[in-house]
Amino acid sequence: MVVGTGTSLALSSLLSLLLFAGMQIYSRQLASTEWLTIQGGLLGSGLFVFSLTAFNNLENLVFGKGFQAKIFPEILLCLLLALFASGLIHRVCVTTCFIFSMVGLYYINKISSTLYQATAPALTPAKVTGKSKKRN
């Protein structure tokens, strides 16, 4: 099921806002045990993915289709937002958020390159059909 760019912008923005609010509401519980701090980093990574999706959809609406997110400023801005939100919970959440975000970014890049990158045809060297001189 594919949604349009505007709908995707609205959904990812709403999910980013709800995830940030949920992280702040349950910050004491997320910081209470080791496993929940790791889960807090995982939630921060989800915030990174949703905010990056919203940011890129906004750019596609403003600048037109085919506009791609670059490392600076889009990815770094969304990563800093997610790391800041995770840092409000616990400092271990920042580390796990960074690790989960980098793994998620790797797979997002891998999937998008297989879907949207055009493959260049393989060039084969042409045979030279000229006459060669015989040397005695």
Swiss-Prot record:
Per the record, the coiled-coil ranges are: none
The answer to whether keyword Iron-sulfur applies is no
Identify the residue span(s) of motif Prevents secretion from ER: 133-136
Broad class of the protein's primary localization: endoplasmic reticulum
Q: Which ranges does the record mark as transmembrane?
A: 6-23, 35-55, 76-108
The signal peptide stretch is none
Sorted alphabetically, which Pfam families does this protein's record hold?
Keratin_assoc (PF09775)
> Topology: which residues are Lumenal?
1-5, 56-75
Q: What is this protein called?
A: Dolichyl-diphosphooligosaccharide--protein glycosyltransferase subunit KCP2
Q: Which organism is it from?
A: Rattus norvegicus (Rat)
